[in-house]
């Protein structure tokens, strides 16, 4: 991909967008090429590229204050743009299309700071470089406009969840990335949504520390242990964030390995075995999701799950146990769980180009709905 790919768009039936997402887990970049002018998104191509180890290490480091952050951040942003550009090329090759066939790319970037309480959120990205490499208009920086309007800037996917999954009965849509967030869909009410707490961010960090594996495949490490009820209660009671009322959001700024180690050190019970901690963390995710849904008084009939956690059968069983209602992946509703977030950012890019406000005050607490994103023409 280079500047030779720039040029007038050819005619392709429908309006095509690309959505790119790299989440809190920092394990890779997901991309979808999608047609958005029908009643439901039509995925034409999908790709998931692993995060290069050196780039992942830099992004992890940038989640904590340190020296020379500005240059490191700029270089990491360029590296992420090149990874995104590879994903775009792969999507176009799969679909047999050219850059001119695509209206825009919605590129989320990589969150390295999320402090709406201080009036900012920072997603590392180099959208100008991505536009240059891809030869396609790029929409980026989706969260800042909502924060400027007094909102949390997260979660942003509830209006997309509503467009896809709302029906005649109350339903919850749960995204299990690094952080868990839930969308509550109730007939006759605007969607509500908020973060519920850690999901894969703690599970991955603990698994990496004790097994050397980047994540707990199929929940096998957790299955070797047992849930420690006293430790679970300690983890919940020691963190004031869990008791906050929505709107609320969080991220790796709060929930990280240091957070967990500090609480394990303060735990007054016997030193737990690593596999028992993993099992307890899995229950922590499910329990805090259930607590948040119960506190909302939404009473969803079922829960649709998307994100990487939907592929963890152990975590899905814990959710069913804690929620006491049907829990199933969004695949069962016709939308692959792995691609929901990338699809959402394609949808948000379309909303930005059409100047349609996509932020929901009932979700983020913003003063009003705003058009989200900034445009970087190719």
UniProtKB/Swiss-Prot annotation:
<comment type="similarity">
    <text>Belongs to the anhydro-N-acetylmuramic acid kinase family.</text>
</comment>
<comment type="pathway">
    <text>Amino-sugar metabolism; 1,6-anhydro-N-acetylmuramate degradation.</text>
</comment>
<dbReference type="GO" id="GO:0097175">
    <property type="term" value="P:1,6-anhydro-N-acetyl-beta-muramic acid catabolic process"/>
</dbReference>
<dbReference type="GO" id="GO:0016773">
    <property type="term" value="F:phosphotransferase activity, alcohol group as acceptor"/>
</dbReference>
<keyword id="KW-0547">Nucleotide-binding</keyword>
<dbReference type="InterPro" id="IPR005338">
    <property type="entry name" value="Anhydro_N_Ac-Mur_kinase"/>
</dbReference>
<dbReference type="GO" id="GO:0006040">
    <property type="term" value="P:amino sugar metabolic process"/>
</dbReference>
<protein>
    <recommendedName>
        <fullName>Anhydro-N-acetylmuramic acid kinase</fullName>
        <ecNumber>2.7.1.170</ecNumber>
    </recommendedName>
</protein>
<feature type="binding site">
    <location>
        <begin position="23"/>
        <end position="30"/>
    </location>
    <ligand>
        <name>ATP</name>
    </ligand>
</feature>
<dbReference type="GO" id="GO:0005524">
    <property type="term" value="F:ATP binding"/>
</dbReference>
<keyword id="KW-0119">Carbohydrate metabolism</keyword>
<comment type="function">
    <text>Catalyzes the specific phosphorylation of 1,6-anhydro-N-acetylmuramic acid (anhMurNAc) with the simultaneous cleavage of the 1,6-anhydro ring, generating MurNAc-6-P. Is required for the utilization of anhMurNAc either imported from the medium or derived from its own cell wall murein, and thus plays a role in cell wall recycling.</text>
</comment>
<dbReference type="GO" id="GO:0016301">
    <property type="term" value="F:kinase activity"/>
</dbReference>
<keyword id="KW-0067">ATP-binding</keyword>
<keyword id="KW-0418">Kinase</keyword>
<dbReference type="Pfam" id="PF03702">
    <property type="entry name" value="AnmK"/>
</dbReference>
<keyword id="KW-0808">Transferase</keyword>
<dbReference type="InterPro" id="IPR043129">
    <property type="entry name" value="ATPase_NBD"/>
</dbReference>
<comment type="pathway">
    <text>Cell wall biogenesis; peptidoglycan recycling.</text>
</comment>
<dbReference type="GO" id="GO:0009254">
    <property type="term" value="P:peptidoglycan turnover"/>
</dbReference>
